[in-house]
Swiss-Prot record:
It comes from the Bacteria. It comes from Kosmotoga olearia (strain ATCC BAA-1733 / DSM 21960 / TBF 19.5.1). Binds to 23S rRNA. Forms part of two intersubunit bridges in the 70S ribosome. Belongs to the universal ribosomal protein uL14 family. PROSITE patterns: RIBOSOMAL_L14 (PS00049). Part of the 50S ribosomal subunit. Forms a cluster with proteins L3 and L19. In the 70S ribosome, L14 and L19 interact and together make contacts with the 16S rRNA in bridges B5 and B8. GO terms for molecular function: large ribosomal subunit rRNA binding; structural constituent of ribosome. Keywords: Ribonucleoprotein, Ribosomal protein, RNA-binding, rRNA-binding. The gene is rplN. This is Large ribosomal subunit protein uL14. The lineage of its organism: Bacteria, Thermotogati, Thermotogota, Thermotogae, Kosmotogales.
Length: 122
């Protein structure tokens, strides 16, 4: 469960390392987000000499959460960290690689490019 002020690790090579959520997309009253949800965030840490700088406002899709999510078959899945992948206006990833596992729910929510770039899909 991702809410305002949550810090997320960035799971791609776009140049950002850590982002801080400032808005969960999906309406003004929406409080929390989960895997596959789009968030607006501020870059808190970045790699030097890249396009994305500290303080930039970016859009990202959540790919891993510590809070477990229930699947339709009754199983649960959770990860060791909260992570996101930075995306552009067309919902395409800015980076060319995705690090760590991602949930297969991303493909169902229309982020098949991120799922195909990932090392593992759980």
């Amino acid at each position: 469960m991702i809410q305002l002020e949550s810090y997320l690790r960035v799971a791609d090579n776009s140049g950002a390392k850590v982002i801080k959520v400032i808005q969960v997309s999906g309406g003004s009253k929406r409080k929390t987000g989960s895997i596959g949800d789009i968030v607006v965030a501020s870059v808190r840490e970045a790699v030097p000499n890249t396009d994305i700088k500290k303080g930039d406002i970016v859009r990202a899709v959540v790919v891993r959460t510590k809070k477990e999510i229930r699947r339709p078959d009754g199983t649960y899945i959770r990860f060791d960290d909260n992570a996101a992948v930075i995306i552009d206006k067309q919902n395409q990833p800015k980076g060319t690689r995705v690090f760590g596992p991602v949930a297969r729910e991303l493909r169902e929510k229309g982020f098949s490019k991120i799922a195909s770039l990932a090392q593992e899909v759980w």
